[in-house]
């Protein structure tokens, strides 16, 4: 089967659109992670302020709540690699860690196996609207949503049978 030049151009335009959308969705993931970290910080300081006995401690926690609401103490960014976008967590001290990998062409999200490589199995596919919305709503800065044994995978994606012989959410 041969493909005409017009078909090739149309397919290339579609691939480029998907790749631009994957970049946009990765930026949205970074924003959602920063928002989650801010909520976590505010919640922790409110809890500590309520438990504090001294006035100085309460004032300190109130100050930290205002700081957290004005500016996030951490930054989630992504670096562009040959095959993946590497979602990076950067704290105020300058330390870096890898939060996730996103395939540049397909939008598949992976948990990191190391600083340089993703884990073998896909966790989410950002091209699928239901999964993308779930990830953006439920992602957390610590990365709990990236574990395969999570209840969310059993609930939403059990019917997805993968080629390596088990369903997402079953024993690994």
Predicted features, each with a name:
Residues 5-75:
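Negatively charged, low-complexity tracts enriched in Asp/Glu with abundant Ser/Thr
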Residues 65-100:
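Exposed beta-strand-loop-beta-strand "reactive/processing" segments of non-cytosolic proteins
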Residues 106-136:
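A short, surface-exposed interaction/processing loop segment used at functional sites
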Residues 127-153:
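C-terminal partner/receptor-binding element of secreted or periplasmic proteins
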């Amino acid at each position: 089967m041969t493909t005409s030049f017009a078909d090739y151009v149309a397919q290339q335009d579609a691939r480029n659109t998907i790749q631009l959308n994957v970049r946009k969705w990765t930026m949205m993931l970074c924003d959602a992670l920063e928002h989650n970290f801010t909520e976590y910080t505010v919640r922790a300081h409110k809890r500590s302020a309520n438990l504090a006995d001294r006035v100085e401690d309460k004032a300190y926690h109130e100050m930290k709540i205002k700081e957290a609401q004005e500016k996030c103490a951490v930054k989630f960014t992504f670096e562009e690699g040959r095959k993946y976008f590497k979602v990076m967590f950067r704290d105020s001290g300058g330390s870096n860690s890898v939060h996730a990998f996103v395939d540049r062409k397909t939008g598949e999200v992976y948990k990191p196996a190391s600083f340089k490589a993703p884990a073998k199995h896909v966790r989410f596919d950002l091209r699928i609207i239901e999964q993308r919305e779930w990830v953006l709503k439920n992602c957390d800065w610590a990365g709990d949503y990236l574990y395969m044994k999570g209840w969310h995978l059993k609930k939403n994606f059990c019917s997805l049978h993968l080629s390596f012989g088990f369903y997402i959410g079953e024993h690994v």
